Amino acid sequence: MNIILLGPPGAGKGTQATNICNKYSIPQISTGDMLRVAVKVGTPLGIEAKKIMDSGGLVSDNIIINLVKERIQHSDCKNGFLFDGFPRTITQAEALRKDSVKINFVIEIQVPDQEIIARMSGRRTHLKSGRTYHITYNQPKVEGIDDITGEKLVQRSDDSENTVRSRLDIYHNQTQPLVNYYQSWMDKDSNAPKYAAAIGIGTLDEVKDRIYNSLISYD
C-alpha cells in the first residue's frame, strides 16, 4: 500500500503516520530524512545535493524525485510506503505521475485552524529536559512550573500564535492545490490515487479509526 499523508502542523500527523506504518508494515519516508542519509552516505545524489545546500541553494525537484525513486526500491518498501511531507508541490506530484510511481491513497488529516492554534500556542516547555505541557490538555501541577525541577516553563517561539498562523498559511498555500490536483485526477481516472479526508479532532484512537476506515472503504 503506497500512501501520501497530508496534514497541517499540530494535526498529529507524526503519530498517525507511525500507526499506519505499523499496521501495514511499511516505512515512513520523508524527503528530509532521505537527504540527510544520502549526504551522510555520500551517494552521487547526496554529493550533488550537498554542493547545492552548502552554497545556500534549494535542492531541485529533479534531485528530490530521483532520491524518492531510489529510496522506494529498497527492500523495506516491498509492502509499500508512506510519504510524509511529500509531494509538496504540483510539480513534484506530476513528476511522480510521469515516472509511474504508483500511489494508492492520499489521506489528508483535517483540523480547523483555530484548533491547531489552540493546540500549539498552548504548549509550554521545560527547555533543559524537553518536557512539554499544555495550558489546557496537560497542565503542570503548578501553573508555569515544571513538575520535576520546579523551574519555569516557557513558550517556544515556534509555538507563538503568530508563528503558528504563518506556518498554517504556508501549509494551506502548498496543500490546497495538491488536494485539488488529486481530487480532479480521481474524478477523471479510476486508476488514480484515492483521496480521502479524515477529521483530526478527537482522541488519537478515534482519528486512527477514521483513517483506517478511509483506507478500508477503498480497499
UniProtKB/Swiss-Prot annotation:
UniProt keyword terms in alphabetical order: ATP-binding, Cytoplasm, Kinase, Nucleotide biosynthesis, Nucleotide-binding, Transferase
Enzymatic class: transferase
Pathway(s) of this molecule: Purine metabolism; AMP biosynthesis via salvage pathway; AMP from ADP: step 1/1
Cellular localisation: Cytoplasm
Gene Ontology molecular function terms on file: adenylate kinase activity; ATP binding
EC number per UniProt: 2.7.4.3
Name of the protein this chain belongs to: Adenylate kinase
Domain free text: Consists of three domains, a large central CORE domain and two small peripheral domains, NMPbind and LID, which undergo movements during catalysis. The LID domain closes over the site of phosphoryl transfer upon ATP binding. Assembling and dissambling the active center during each catalytic cycle provides an effective means to prevent ATP hydrolysis.
Short name of one Pfam family: ADK
Gene3D superfamilies (alphabetical): P-loop containing nucleotide triphosphate hydrolases
Binding residues for AMP: 31, 36, 57-59, 85-88, 92, 156, 167
Region of interest (LID), residue spans: 122-159
